[in-house]
Amino acid sequence: MEKRFLELFSGCQSAHGQTTVLDAQRNGKTKANSITVRTPLTIELIKEHLSGKKGIGAIPIREDNLCQFAALDIDDYNLDLLMLRKKVSRLELPLVMCRSKSGGAHLYLFMTEFIPAAEIRDKLAEMASALGFGSCELFPKQDTVKAERGDLGSWINLPYQNSEYTTRYALDEGADSLTL
């Protein structure tokens, strides 16, 4: 399972994101420290993510500016997940919807081959507009990165952290949680 998960989120080969939860705040949110770590995303890190030991993020854009996965990040705290799920289906968009850490949604696009990030971002922008979220974040955030000078793309938190008790899961047609 971990190997397939890593394959789905294949991106930058030289870095990943990592989040450590520090403590809970009064408003119910958690205080966390998020950093970019300049080591590859590995099966061991995926295991730690799925077990809840570490929160891991993946960088969709590779050093050659190609992507095999991408995402829309909709951070709307009053988001009606069922309505959004139905809209994705009605528009026949090839997106896998997951509840995000904030209670919004990450809508993932998985491709069978690597495609230039600029092309993917154009398609994501079209999909976001069709869904009524034209100003949401797109991952990759960059059309290109200058790998030769050490630039990296931005990372997105992966779903299913602490998979047995997660609040970050994929949603079926009825917006009910799907297990791994």
Where are these regions (language model features)?
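An amphipathic, hydrophobic-aromatic interaction surface with interspersed Lys/Arg
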Residues: 94
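Short loop/turn and capping residues at structural boundaries
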Residues: 17-20, 99, 139
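DNA replication initiation modules
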Residues: 56-79, 85, 90, 111-180
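Short, conserved phosphate-binding/catalytic loop or strand-edge motifs used
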Residues: 97-106
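DNA replication initiation on ssDNA origins
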Residues: 1-69, 77-86, 153-155, 160-163
